[in-house]
């Protein structure tokens, strides 16, 4: 009875066995290319169930598809090929590719994957550690660093742009200085630490602690599986102004008065040291049929109610775009109730003009930012100033224009694709 009880206590739970991770295979020294005749050490670190402690712990080693005879946790090898290891009850480890060279010069790169923000170290090594002179490092055929003698090339914070094919060249004294020699090219890939974030509007059931009438935005991203424990911080912006600086929370509540300008928001994700920073695109409002679409829900969302036609304040509307372009635009007298001018061609924050309108845009109309209003006022001021200049420089011409019954022409520049004007009430 007692031996059976002991066995039951040593057996891992089914949940623990189901979550066994693959062992970690490491290389010492950490270079994937060595000279012929050299040896390196491979070490396999993995989880071993307690039940197996009753027997000698066994580690399986593979060279390609060949099972090696050793069952130790570490082995010394000098044969080129692809190595893997496996512990009982766990999957096979990730591979390590070992290369053996007979050249005078080799370029050594680390075996472990290099992620964004981490240092990338390259080592140009002469035959059995002979000193290399006039050392050059190349990235995709372009020289990136020069050293007088043997030295490592280090990129302190690697980026995706640092991926590519590397090579080194130099001379050695054997016994006199040789002609420049080149190593074989080695491919290096900098892994993405996390994806570029995407800003989205959270539904009523997803939002937590949202202020009444506000809208909760979430900055979503995904870490690499091998770096899923890396902490990230998030910041939120409205146009170029930070509405919340970097913090650990991935959510931000937009106050109710600012709900109408949701498309002017974007976010940024970064590591705690800011070694890797990535920004999101502008917020894209939900399309038709989505859970956040006001027309597809029985209870309207707070931001949908705030954007209803009867609740939104007055705003300038962008005139429709036409293919025909008029040459000039008429301007009324200053004594009239308004002044006509061409619409601004400045870009606005939000989706492109060619994107199909969403139900929210059809019901609430185009949301114009303060920047567009400022540009329109500047154009109005430009028109008034042009009339003042005309009166100062050409008084006679102005009197002749005033004496004619026809409406004077405008001195405004017409932006392409603006067939009509928008009156602004004075």
From Swiss-Prot:
Signal peptide start and end residues: 1-17
Pfam families in alphabetical order: Ig_2 (PF13895)
Compositional bias (Polar residues): 406-426
SMART domains registered for this protein in UniProt: IG
Entry-linked InterPro entries: Ig-like_dom, Ig-like_dom_sf, Ig-like_fold, Ig_Fc_receptor, Ig_sub
Main location per the UniProt record: cytoplasm
GO cellular component terms given for this protein: cytoplasm; endoplasmic reticulum; external side of plasma membrane
Residue numbers spanned by region Disordered: 400-426
PROSITE patterns according to UniProt: IG_LIKE
Molecular function via GO: transmembrane signaling receptor activity
Tissue distribution: Expressed at low levels. Expressed in B-lymphocytes. Detected in tonsil, lung, kidney, spleen and placenta. Expressed by a small subset of germinal center B-cells in tonsils and by melanocytes (at protein level).
GO BP, sorted A to Z: cell surface receptor signaling pathway; immunoglobulin mediated immune response; negative regulation of immune response
Gene3D superfamilies with a match to the protein in the record: Immunoglobulins
Localization: Cytoplasm; Endoplasmic reticulum
Glycosylation site residues: 152
Domain Ig-like C2-type intervals: 23-101, 103-189
Keywords for the protein's UniProt record, in alphabetical order: Cytoplasm, Disulfide bond, Endoplasmic reticulum, Glycoprotein, Immunoglobulin domain, Repeat, Signal
SS bonds (residue pairs): 44-85, 124-168
Name of the protein described by the UniProt record: Fc receptor-like B
Organism: Homo sapiens (Human)
Gene name of the encoded protein: FCRLB
